[in-house]
């Protein structure tokens, strides 16, 4: 909720949208059925519900249970924070949420204590001038976000030469860049190469791995896990979790020396699934036929023009089960827990950072600053400079490095699809990437 952020300000001058938290996933099963597409699903984990939109028309009881648990937890943390900053009881805040104040006169937000007063947008600049004692006729210098970022960029480096690297691993974990969008996300081969460079750079004394990922390719997750493990042999590695670090996002995090999460971080989701479409029904509808000549039994394995036979299903489920066992083993080793203990909190279930700390999946609650403090302490250094990786390209370089067709297509799709562009990217990634996925069951938008 936007009010959770604004409530921390010294004064609030706006009508508040305050209505609670909801998670409302889309389900595609009936649509796929109408066009003759069947999703063949293989998974391990009762709560691993990423496949549900393709094979069901509503949430399973297990998924409904976990979603209810974590949105209730997040809402509880939001209301506690707003209660403290605005001096309003949690009970009152829930009453206000149920009243849908945004449909009432704006003065109602002031009466309820969610805002301090009302002010027109055009009057904000003059109000700020009064606060900083500038005459109304004088210019009010305002720093934009870009200006503030440049201020940090121009801070002189510490003379010690010590570097604490903050490596940002954000987005879907993939085996290779997606052609669906202009954003690459966490591309396995690139991240591994970058982490190897950080390992070999003697000036880098510690690494904070900032993970903000719902997961993705199980293969790429395993490769990145190994790269993080190798990096850890040379210098401290601290994971700082963002909005979510779940499934594959947790996979690449679990081996770190210390894991720091926000109370509202979505993490865990220790589970694996595979999902492959069978389009035979569609091809029958439109009059397409299919034939094959092969040298060996499984030569056309994975062909979406036909359903899997029983042998192929058994092979796939065996691979998924083995992948899950490896995932659990990695978590047990990284967290210094038994496999049995991990299995009790795995099954694909998502946890908030607050609960994950109680379960032993994370070590500390806090943000990236706390992770940096821990990294510096473990490295045993005093003077240091924080450097962000991977280096961000400017817009022109990024454009020149992008295939023109892909860039133009992605921008056109983004403008046409609007809020559904993210779902399109997810579907496209599922089509292009490996069939075995370690991914969070959903996208959560808090409104």
Model-derived features with residue positions:
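Extended, hydrophobic alpha-helical segments in both membrane/secreted and soluble proteins
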Residues: 6, 105, 191-195, 204-269, ...
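Intrinsic disorder and flexible/low-complexity segments
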Residues: 159-164, 168-201, 319, 390-447
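Single conserved hydrophobic/aromatic residue that forms the stacking wall/gate
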Residues: 1-9, 13
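C-terminal long alpha-helix characteristic of the crotonase
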Residues: 84-85, 116-163, 328-334, 363-404
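Non-cytosolic juxtamembrane linkers/loops
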Residues: 124-125, 130-210, 214-224
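Envelope-exposed proteins and targeting segments
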Residues: 17-19, 35, 162-165, 203-207, ...
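Solvent-exposed loop/turn segments at secondary-structure junctions
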Residues: 14-19, 29, 39, 46-49, ...
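Charged, glycine-interspersed solvent-exposed loop segments at helix/strand-loop junctions
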Residues: 29-129, 280, 284-365, 369-375, ...
């Amino acid at each position: 909720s936007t009010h959770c952020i604004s409530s921390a300000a010294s004064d609030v001058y706006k009508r508040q949208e305050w209505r609670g938290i909801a998670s409302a996933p889309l389900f595609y099963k009936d649509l796929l059925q109408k066009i003759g597409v069947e999703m063949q699903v293989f998974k391990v984990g009762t709560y691993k519900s990423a496949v549900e939109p393709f094979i069901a028309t509503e949430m399973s009881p297990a998924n409904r249970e976990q979603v209810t648990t974590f949105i209730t937890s997040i809402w509880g943390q939001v209301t506690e924070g707003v209660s403290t900053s605005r001096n309003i009881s949690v009970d009152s805040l829930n009453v206000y949420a149920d009243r849908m104040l945004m449909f009432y006169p704006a003065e109602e937000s002031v009466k309820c204590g969610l805002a301090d007063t009302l002010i027109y947008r055009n009057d904000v600049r003059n109000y700020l001038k009064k606060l900083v004692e500038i005459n109304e006729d004088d210019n009010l210098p305002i720093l934009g976000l870009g200006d503030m970022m440049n201020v940090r960029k121009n801070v002189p480096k510490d003379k010690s030469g010590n570097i604490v690297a903050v490596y940002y691993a954000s987005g879907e974990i993939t085996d290779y860049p997606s052609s669906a969008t202009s954003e690459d996300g966490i591309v396995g081969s690139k991240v591994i190469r970058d982490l190897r460079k950080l390992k070999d750079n003697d000036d880098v004394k510690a690494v904070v791995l900032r993970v903000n990922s719902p997961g993705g390719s199980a293969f790429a997750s395993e490769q990145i896990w190994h790269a993080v493990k190798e990096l850890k042999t040379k210098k401290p590695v601290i994971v700082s979790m963002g909005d979510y670090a779940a499934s594959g996002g947790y996979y690449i995090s679990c081996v770190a020396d210390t894991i720091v999460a926000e109370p509202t971080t979505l993490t865990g989701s220790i589970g694996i699934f595979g999902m492959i479409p069978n389009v035979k029904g569609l091809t029958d509808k439109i009059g397409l036929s299919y034939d094959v000549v092969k040298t060996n039994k499984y030569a056309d394995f994975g062909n979406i023009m036909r359903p899997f036979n029983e042998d192929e299903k058994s092979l796939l489920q065996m691979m998924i089960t083995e992948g899950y066992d490896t995932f659990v083993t990695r978590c047990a080793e990284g967290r210094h827990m038994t496999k049995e203990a991990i299995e009790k909190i795995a099954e694909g279930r998502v946890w908030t950072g607050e609960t994950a700390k109680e379960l032993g999946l994370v070590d500390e609650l806090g943000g990236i600053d706390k992770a940096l403090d821990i990294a510096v302490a473990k490295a045993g250094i005093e003077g240091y400079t924080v450097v962000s990786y991977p280096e961000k390209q400017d817009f022109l370089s990024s454009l020149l490095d992008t295939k023109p067709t892909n860039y133009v297509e992605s921008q056109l799709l983004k403008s046409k699809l609007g809020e559904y562009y993210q779902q399109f990217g997810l579907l496209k990634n599922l089509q292009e990437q490996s069939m075995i996925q370690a991914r969070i069951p959903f996208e959560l938008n808090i409104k």
